[in-house]
Amino acid sequence: ETVHHVGFLVSKKGAIRGKHFHKEQKQYTLVQKGKIKVTIKNLEDKNSIVESKELNKMDMVLFPPYVYHSIEAVEDSECLIFTSKSRKGSGYEDDTFRVENINSFEL
């Protein structure tokens, strides 16, 4: 798989990032420092439930297309973000769909 963007995400304890999904791109997140809690839901599966998991240093997670994801910093954290689509210009916003309340959201 080709990586078209690498980002560096720095979050203070308690910060919640993401709360969105992508229709086209895959996103890999690698914890470099600290601890995070990822919350996901497969939006293409009507029977999918909201799931959460804590990740530590050097853990990696893949968010495929149509998987809602949020990242909460359990501790001050640093993550590398790798995506399969460029985020130059409007590349990020063009494929980012925000979700305020995942518990009531449907496609």
Q: What positions do the PLM features span?
A:
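A short glycine-rich, His/Asp/Glu-containing loop-to-beta-strand
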Residues: 1-19
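Tight coil/turn sites that cap or link beta-strands
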Residues: 12-14, 57-58, 64-66, 76
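Short beta-strand His + acidic residue motifs that chelate non-heme Fe in jelly-roll/DSBH
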Residues: 19, 38-39, 63, 69-74, ...
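His/acidic/aromatic-lined binding-pocket segments of jelly-roll/cupin-type domains
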Residues: 20, 26-31, 53, 61, ...
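A generic "binding-loop/recognition-motif" signal
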Residues: 24, 59, 67, 75, ...
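Glycine- and acidic-residue-biased ligand/ion/polar-headgroup-sensing regions
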Residues: 24-43
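Short acidic-glycine-tyrosine-enriched beta hairpin
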Residues: 43-65
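Double-stranded beta-helix
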Residues: 74-107
